[in-house]
UniProtKB/Swiss-Prot annotation:
SMART domains: REC. CDD domains: REC_typeA_ARR (cd17581). One of its GO terms (cellular component) is nucleus. Residues 158-180 have a biased composition (Low complexity). Functions as a response regulator involved in His-to-Asp phosphorelay signal transduction system. Phosphorylation of the Asp residue in the receiver domain activates the ability of the protein to promote the transcription of target genes. Type-A response regulators seem to act as negative regulators of the cytokinin signaling. This is Two-component response regulator ORR10. Induction: By cytokinin in roots and shoots.
């Protein structure tokens, strides 16, 4: 009997520095993650199907499912769009906001770290990123999946209740038909004893 093998989690790594990008890619693959790397925030948004100047997706729902990114890890200091700007774009998007985002930076600046965490970042790693940091990623992915599963269940339940409440006429109709049938039967039973009389020989 064949055993189903679970697909590895897919991480999108964003960093304008080639050496840093190669390092994070190697660490992620060593930790059994599927990895896609890009060198800018705008390319990350393009890969995710989002304009870098709009909140609306440019891809269809099936395209989004094919991308299937489970987590985004991005450098903070990048030319053009910073990691913080990318984080804000993701959290402002209705269909990307639940993807966990991890920020990386060489600078240990508390105000920067707090700002990213307040904006919705799940972790803030100081560079150089270590292999031990990779173990912190999976819990965020699993938490996001549980949340997504719960939201899907709530959506299905809401649709089911909506469908049930939109069809009361059919139930009332059948109930009314049944009531009328009982009334006719009762009337017939009252009439029968008076109309059928015994014959005298």
């Amino acid at each position: 009997m064949a055993v189903a093998i679970e697909a590895p989690f897919h991480v999108l790594a964003v960093d304008d520095s080639l050496p840093d990008r190669k390092l994070i890619e190697r660490l992620l693959k060593t930790s059994s993650f599927q990895v896609t790397t890009v060198d800018s925030g705008s390319k990350a948004l393009e890969f995710l199907g989002l304009h870098d100047h709009e909140d609306s997706p440019i891809s269809t729902q099936s395209d989004q499912q094919e991308v299937g990114v489970n987590l985004i890890i991005t450098d903070y200091c990048m030319p053009g769009m910073t990691g913080y700007d990318l984080l804000k774009k993701i959290k402002e998007s209705s269909y990307l906001r639940d993807i966990p985002v991890v920020i990386m930076s060489s600078d240990n600046i508390p105000s920067r770290i707090n700002r990213c965490l307040e904006e919705g970042a799940d972790e803030f790693f100081l560079k150089p990123v270590r292999l031990s940091d990779m173990s912190k990623l999976k819990p965020h992915i699993l938490k996001s999946r549980c949340k997504e599963h719960y939201q899907q269940e709530q959506h299905l339940q809401s649709n089911s209740e909506s469908n049930n409440s939109s069809n009361p006429t059919s139930e009332n109709s059948s109930s009314s038909t049944s009531t009328n049938s009982h009334k006719r039967k009762a009337v017939d039973e009252e009439i029968l004893p008076h109309t059928i009389r015994p014959r005298h020989s």
